[in-house]
Amino acid sequence: MSAGSVWMLGACGMGVGPLAIFLRGEGWEVSGWDDSTGSPMELQLADAEIPLLRDPWAAGRSPGLVGRSSAVKPGHPALALAESRGARVLRRGELLAERVAARRFVAVCGSHGKTTTCGMIVAALTGAGADFGYVLGGLFRDPAMPPARASASSPWVVAEVDESDGTIGAFSPDVTVAVNLDWDHPDYYRDEADLEAVFRRLFERTRTAVIIPAGNARLERLTAGLRVPVLRVGAEGDYRVRPVAGDHATSVLELGGAFPATQVTVPVAGTFNRANAAMALAAAHVVTGSVAADPLGRWRGIRRRQDVLFERPGLRVLADYAHHPTEIAALLRWLRETHSGRVIVVFQPHRHTRTRQYAAEFRQALSAADHALVMPVYSAGEAAVEGGGSESVVAGSAHRLIEDRRALPEALDALVAGQEAVVAFVGAGDIERDAEAYAKRQRRVGAAVTPDLPDLVAGRLSPECALRANEPLARRTTLGLGGNARWYAEPATVDDVVTLLRACAELDLRWFVVGRGSNLLVPDDGYDGLVLHLDSSRWGEVTPLGEGRLRVGGGARLKELCGLAAREGLAGFEFLEGIPGTLGGSLRMNAGAMGGWIFDVVESVEWLSPQGRVRAARRDSFDA
């Protein structure tokens, strides 16, 4: 299949997003869509110039192929649209399998640690100077490492393959790296035998080698009698690895057997992390035939994998993706190995079917913590099932059910109570937002004086930037109604805007942009946050570029833009006459009148993201 136009559904997720970026690197015209936005993956898509379009055909694109997350179910409006256009629809795994079918493919599979091990293989190959492509199932902590990359000059591609939806059956790898295997996904597989059969068939389709951890009885049984070599990794494996030293953040590994005899230092600690690193080094050696002196020198970890969000003497707050009893048990062992003090876990079960299947195992795994708080189940679109609620996890134990997440911060504060502790937020749902909120809370509590906006921006704003407290908003609207803004700013430069938005993020402070305030209703009790106003004198400049083109600032008033266009002899702007407001606001809502729309006259847009990055895209990248 040659490169063409593709529409990726569920593009802000950790499975589809990286694949979209990989396809873009291969030369495809890629657009995406997701019902849920705000994911960190959205920034990666923007960096790769992949627009989110509700209807790519309406934007002038003609995707003949649609890739979808398995979470996008039949009957979804986007799928119905794709089918009505005659597009071919593939699940994420099926599409990835087609793209790597003619490549030398390294498949990373297993129940736990796929993303971490895959990321470590990428880091090890990068450290060895290898040329290759990859597709991760998450985000690197290192912002310089994108979640996917295509290589036009190398046949090698590394990616994790997902067993949860059966698409693992579409792959025929050169090298298969099986990190482990436990019973999981009872919503898809009838029993363990079904799951094992899928992995056995994958091993049988593998063309060069299968890599497994030494001593794993289940994987030994499933790889018995294969026609390709089975390479074992561990203290007694073909690739011998033995930890000989280390601390809470690093490990010294002694390598031997199929490895060159040497010692290497890797930036990981704990039994599970060392095992993942060993598997990654073995896979990199199979591909390159060598081991770099600093094999994981680029390794900074994976987001939501033992991700430390806050730390001060006596308290550490972290988030982890663990959502299976084995993963939780491994995480808690790592916490005991690398942290002193009490271990407090906040667990959000993922999917009702998994919760029902493993309620007792979750209860047992959580018992390794000093305290366990259990949140309501994150359904991931599943309907509730009997016995699939969080109540089944806490039943008959000392674990505490937190039914209202608003009560969580006070519950944690009472448990921490000035004693040395680590607080781990655990789960594959949206518990990360609770973790980030609690980390922000601790940063505020830890300050000698609770800071407010002026404290964080002092000395960092331009002299021309206005920042005022308790600003009346009634005079900022055409209706002349409403209360005051807690903070009001008129930034003079892009740097001013970035500084203000980052301070709001640190303070967990809401913000809102007001233009002319046309038909804007402000509550009588005002706005408890920051109101930003882009004054037209600084942000409304209009520059003629010739050939019927204008460069216009977002603060320009539409009436003035229409008048200037008339003076320049430019047609097509007449519909703007009589529309109140500024250009920025009109772009936000695709303002129009008399059969004309603002995007009819737009060539491209440059804007600032909430994270402070300057973005630019052409008209067909917008869902307008």
Model-derived features: where do they sit?
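ATP-dependent carboxylate-amine ligase
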Residues: 1-52, 62-66, 74, 84-87, ...
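Phosphate-binding loop of NTP-binding sites
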Residues: 22-25, 70, 74-214, 218-229, ...
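Residue-level signal for inorganic ion chemistry
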Residues: 23, 66, 108, 132, ...
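Short beta-strand "acidic-cap" motif of Rossmann-like dinucleotide-binding folds
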Residues: 29-34, 133-134, 232, 513, ...
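Glycine-rich beta-strand-to-loop/alpha-helix junction loops that act as flexible
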Residues: 69-71, 214, 425-430, 514-518, ...
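A gly/ser-rich beta-alpha-beta helix-loop segment of oxidoreductase catalytic cores
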Residues: 109, 562-568, 572-603, 609
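Anion-binding (especially nucleotide phosphate/pyrophosphate-binding) glycine-rich loop
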Residues: 452-583
